[in-house]
């Protein structure tokens, strides 16, 4: 509890300096490189020959807002389940997310839309940046409660760069399809975070064990996150799929997959629960696995039945993961996975990549007709067979796992830098480390109430 | 408290088996019957001659997402007002809703869009399935806290089938108009639930009375539900009304009606409250009656004034219902209506059906011009006079009340099956029946805190 | 605590009578004056020659729903941070908002769209009414906890009228640009509320000081408000900007500005916090200043860098305002600003107006091309130079400050009317004044638990 004055002074300056330095650096890079794209710039748009209704905005904006809500409301509140870590869960989600959006704009811009010395940003950039922020927040879930904000900012710095690189290799170099990011977002974010958590392994974390669970209200707050993720996931997967049939098909597949993962989660949770009781952790997380598992395949001709089957399987695996695999992960593999991202994003993400490869291999010209061009342009143009595209999909998964693991190791070593002010083992999962905390746990407001009480009794 | 081992074993298997059986059955039926519709299928869409912007998706998707949010966030959190039943309220909303979406897709598909041996699903199917899930959750509100999850799944099984049948009779056979579902959703859902609750009457429910109220925080959670329902209701009523003028008119009428029901709710709540105090129950529920009461009429030329008048009346009746009618309902009619669905959905739903009939009877060619075709095709085509259409509307209300009541009786008898594991009278409104519950009410986390305290004092 | 029976009787009638009178009056005015506009009326729409996709609804509705969510979910929950005032914060937001929407429709209708003896309402009217309700809720933030519902309704009555007038002078008479309302909404709402709070100065407010802070859970509820405001702010600023490039550019600028204000808020909060700790009040509020500061300039060619710079500055100023300026505001200027609206809406609003004037002065034909017409029609048509338009912008700010201050004084005097039942100094920030409050603070539910306990122990 007692801190050296120097350490306190260090912390006082560390976070402000990092924030201001990062903000300053991205602002300078924005000034030099970032410009409005043709849909967003007044002169360029009006120079073109199109009706206002053709603007990308009207095809993407409602989905963008849903994705934005998922990243900040969804991931943010999902992590409020911890009893004394709600400020940090929401606050650091906010901080990491905001930084990731700026930095991802630059990284993705340099790799995807750098023309004539400039990055051109528009609706798609915003959605892509939100996707990247989503991956960062998935990794945050693995190390939640055991890392300080300065560590997390450095994690985001590294992860966004590697995310952009991995995405570039998959989508641009390998021609892999991954509209909803089973690989690029979920698998990458999960294994990056898990490997990082392994490097940061804390053998004496049991000192904070009493804060690692939820309380009644914190579980209700977490359900805000769950439900917003669940309802908006169809927008997440379809935000960048092709206009016309692509967006509704993706949304519809995701919708049905999620209903199935919900049913299988309840079934398995009751089956493995003590006295047949349901477990809130399963409902909060595993019910969402249906969205992850169709991240790659939902834009394909998966069929509504295929969506149900995939969701059902993902919900079951995820629930069993929480029950049986998470404890082993900690005891045997020394991976402390606070939110169970391995169960929600890791395994369902890999499963989603495999499902995507399977659906790709089964692609026929009959099933897609003239729509093949927008889902599998390389097959439609005769450059690849369905089988070879499927092999590329599997190769994309391997590349992702490689990037994520290497990044996690690198990130872990980076975060071990001693001046980054990691919380001690006994102060994990505790908002007081970084926040002024009022009431209920014995602070100002509580004091005031204590002072008041004698008056009432007198 | 003490349970026979056999009962526990039964429960352990009952819910998993039901979930898996239902999921398996719908999956098989999906595999056989459900196909993408022309807007969603790659080959069919690209075979047609249309621009991508014509896809139904761009006219319906934002409204669909709002409806989806209302059903899961809105209805879910609205029921969290009970102090010890938040997990169940949110969890069973999730479970029932997910199952209802799948099952409604099949039932509505067989009745509405079964062509060439297949059900064709697209944006409208998703919205219709959400509407049906909404009706199931209204019924859930009537029996909240007094039923287990297995009972609720069976209720949903029956209710979805009857909902689809009633909807088919009204919209397809009788040619009744009911865009926002004053009859098909609210009246049906409410009276189905109320009659079912009557059949399940518990004379000794006072044993759980101390859990039947709210606590401070649970009321704030419930307000999440209220406000999301309130803001998105314009989308609920307009999600399936005609393109062009139909959607904005419906949304606008609903918007104004809700402002009026809010004002009249506050007025009446303070008027009948102890010492002029406002009651959160009224604000959480009756303020929404304005959305219900224009469910039928909001697509019509109701005029903004008509919307205000209807909303004002609905808010007042609903508030008075909570104050004076709910107690009578329990004491005289033996209907225990946990959420007061009779006040929010029952009476305003019937009132909405009557308002719809009135507006229908007042329809003129002058008021609608060439727009008459899309609101009242049968009148526009000269097959019916306005008066005869109005009589059909009233007949639709009667049919709905009949289906709902018969369904409620049937459902009540079904849910009385002894192996369905209903909670005992003393354990109603209690999450512990079905959930692992941490903290605050004396479980693990609390234990940990107690252990910790001596350390702090030492 | 003891009240005279007459006072209680007065209160019992005051709020109901005000609500019903206001509702009755607006309903009558709606009946006489308000009609559907050409996009919403069946006959008028079908009389025109356009495709359904041209309807304003499809360009504005998704943004409208986001704005609606911001006003009721965002502003509502943001004010739940007070430990014992959650019912009032949410309930009065609801009441004031609903009344403001109706009354603003009339006021703005008379001033902006009164043709042929009628006000014509459609999508834009709904958005404009929501904007006005937003301003009323900003003022509510300044007097939160110190005013009763009857006082607040009268405040809304006056403020909506003056808001409409100020907006009319700026947008219609002076030709000022202010799409996201840095002046018309934020500056106006903040200074109206602050001056009003000054007139209502309570020298003995410390009697309620122990209720003026937050508790752990109330801060989490407030974050619901913060995050929904943050994610949907791009829709707020772009809801009424021009079709085509205008809406995406405005949304994009707002998005980046908010990321920057979030980073600078965290930096400054940690810098000025005790032991380098972060303060939830800053994160809840100052992180949003980026949305306010680009309210005027976001539709202009601000550039992504400009958005970052503006947001960064606004977040920093707002955080420093909470830390250093709010205490002075109370001690020296006798302005008790409950939510710190001066920091979130006042200073960033004025800054936003200045930024707007700067960007206006820098306008060139090259930067906007043919798009100049839709952002600065008077410059495009040659009626004004960029400099003279910039001077008009500054003049608009002065007019706004004048209207707001005069309105605040007038409002303060009005709210001092003794029969309006203001809460006594010792009962401020306390829900019990106006609401039936259960549990946790020693009411019914708590009683029930006490009764139960002996049974358990016996």
From Swiss-Prot, chains A, B, C:
Pfam families: Ammonium_transp. GO terms for cellular component: basolateral plasma membrane; spectrin-associated cytoskeleton. It catalyses: NH4(+)(in) = NH4(+)(out); methylamine(out) = methylamine(in); CO2(out) = CO2(in). It is found in: Cell membrane; Basolateral cell membrane. Residues 35-61, 108-124, 171-178, 241-251, 304, 368-393 are extracellular. Keywords: Ammonia transport, Cell membrane, Glycoprotein, Membrane, Transmembrane, Transmembrane helix, Transport. Its main location: membrane. InterPro entries: Ammonium/urea_transptr, NH4_transpt_AmtB-like_dom, RhesusRHD. Residues 1-13, 83-86, 146-149, 202-219, 273-282, 326-346, 415-458 are cytoplasmic. A motif (Basolateral sorting signal) lies at residues 429-432. The chain crosses the membrane at residues 14-34, 62-82, 87-107, 125-145, 150-170, 179-201, 220-240, 252-272, 283-303, 305-325, 347-367, 394-414. One of its GO terms (biological process) is ammonium homeostasis. Glycans are attached at residue 49. GO terms for molecular function: ammonium channel activity; ankyrin binding; carbon dioxide transmembrane transporter activity. Ammonium transporter involved in the maintenance of acid-base homeostasis. Transports ammonium and its related derivative methylammonium across the basolateral plasma membrane of epithelial cells likely contributing to renal transepithelial ammonia transport and ammonia metabolism. May transport either NH4(+) or NH3 ammonia species predominantly mediating an electrogenic NH4(+) transport. May act as a CO2 channel providing for renal acid secretion. Belongs to the ammonium transporter (TC 2.A.49) family. Rh subfamily. This is Ammonium transporter Rh type B.
